[in-house]
Regions:
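Conserved beta-ketoacyl condensing-enzyme motif
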Residues: 50-121, 248-267
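Short, well-ordered amphipathic alpha-helical segments that serve as non-catalytic structural scaffolds
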Residues: 30-31, 54-68, 100-102, 230-245, ...
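Condensing-enzyme catalytic core mediating Claisen C-C bond formation in acyl metabolism
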Residues: 1-50, 161-233, 237, 331, ...
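Flexible, glycine-rich active-site loops centered on histidine and acidic residues
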Residues: 139-172
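Conserved catalytic cysteine-centered active-site region
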Residues: 28-52, 87-145, 275-305
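Acidic, glycine-rich active-site loops and adjacent beta-strand->loop/helix elements
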Residues: 81-87, 121-126, 150-155, 194-195, ...
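A contiguous, well-structured pocket-lining segment that forms one wall/lid of small-molecule binding clefts
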Residues: 216-292
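Structural signature of cysteine-dependent C-C bond-forming condensing enzymes
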Residues: 67-76, 109-115, 138-151, 183, ...
Length: 344
């Protein structure tokens, strides 16, 4: 995660507007307090105001490679999940050419030209989908070690006049998926993916600022009620589908790593999933880690950064031990959602 911490007090000087451009009636203090109550967010991380997205990716990947302990040129696949490409310095927009995976491969100095490097645009579930694709590549014999990256620099994409700008944050998470996990019957047990893309296709989108004097048409926008309804309905269902494929139930799972959109949504995931299985509520303290209070919503980087915190013992009360079954589940723009059952 970036080192730059942004507390909620940072936004007290902001003028938040309604979609029609009128000023919100509540004071900034009351508005921010209400958002904190609903989302649970107290702070988030932003990258420095200088530079682009590449240093954030490179640092996260270098940390992953150091933990892996093998030659970086043994990486024969790179998949980068993101939402808007390389976010340029300041607010100069973003580039998708060359693609992020190519920029990352160049920055890391990986010389193996057999190492494919491509991006996926799949909203917040992009990193989980990247892990699924890496698994396929390994099963097909196309790769042995795939670097899967989820990167988000939302601080350059948000509308500063939109209250939702307080929710999103920056981050990058990385995992190296290797053939030995597949061969040893560890790693991915099962997975499921839904892509609806019906009336919900524009629940999350890019559009103009609520400040009519701004001309940038590529700022993050969200219909929060539609997103909440979709997520709380379909994430439990896609988890059940993945568990059914593995012959498991929610009671067999040791930990659930959910996309961290807001605290209220996490409780709804647990409640709805428990109802589907007819079991008592899943304890947020026991099986469902919460990081949104200090990370914000880092979109596609959420699950890998949360996993890293747990594996490194940096998230109090949570530990992943060998043999544990963990569900990764995410939801985002499209609308898409997915779930993956992983055995450590």
């Amino acid at each position: 995660m970036p080192e730059r911490r942004i507390e909620n007090s940072f936004f007290l000087s902001r003028t938040f507007l309604n979609p029609d451009g009128s000023a919100m009636e509540k004071s900034p203090e009351d508005t921010i307090a209400k958002l904190e109550q609903i989302t649970g967010i107290k702070e988030r991380r932003y990258i420095p105001e200088t530079g682009d997205s590449v240093p954030l990716m490179r640092t996260a990947c270098e940390n992953a490679l150091e933990s892996w302990g093998q030659d970086k040129n043994l990486i024969d696949g790179i998949i980068v999940a993101h939402n808007a490409g390389n976010m340029l310095e300041g607010r100069q927009g973003f580039h998708t050419v060359p693609n992020m995976a190519a920029l990352l491969k160049n920055s890391l100095g990986i010389e193996n030209y057999d190492c494919f490097a491509y991006d996926i645009l799949f909203g917040c579930p992009g990193w989980v989908q990247g892990v699924i694709q890496a698994h396929h590549s390994i099963q097909m014999g196309d790769a042995k070690n795939v670097l899967v990256v989820g990167v988000e620099v939302a601080s350059r994409l948000v509308d500063p006049y939109d209250l939702d700008s307080m929710i999103l944050a920056d981050g990058c998470g990385v995992a190296i998926i290797s053939a030995d996990e597949v061969e040893n019957q560890g790693g991915i047990i099962s997975y499921a993916t839904y892509s609806h893309a019906h009336d919900d296709v524009k629940a999350i989108y890019l559009d103009k600022s609520y400040n009519k004097e701004w001309s940038d048409p590529t700022l993050f926008k969200m219909n929060g009620k539609d997103v909440y309804k979709y997520a709380t309905t379909w994430v439990p269902k896609v988890i059940m589908k993945a568990l059914d494929k593995a012959g498991l139930t929610a009671g067999d799972v040791d930990m659930f790593l959910f996309h961290q959109a807001n605290g209220k949504m996490l409780h709804a995931f647990a409640h709805n999933l428990a109802q589907m299985y007819g079991i008592e509520g899943l304890s947020l303290d026991g099986k469902i880690p919460v990081t949104i209070d200090f990370t914000g919503n880092t979109s596609v980087a959420t699950i890998p950064t949360m996993l890293d915190l747990i594996l490194k013992g940096k998230l109090a009360g949570y530990q992943i031990k060998p043999g544990m079954k963990v569900v990764f589940a995410s939801v985002g723009a499209g609308m898409h959602c997915n779930a993956l059952v992983y055995q450590f």
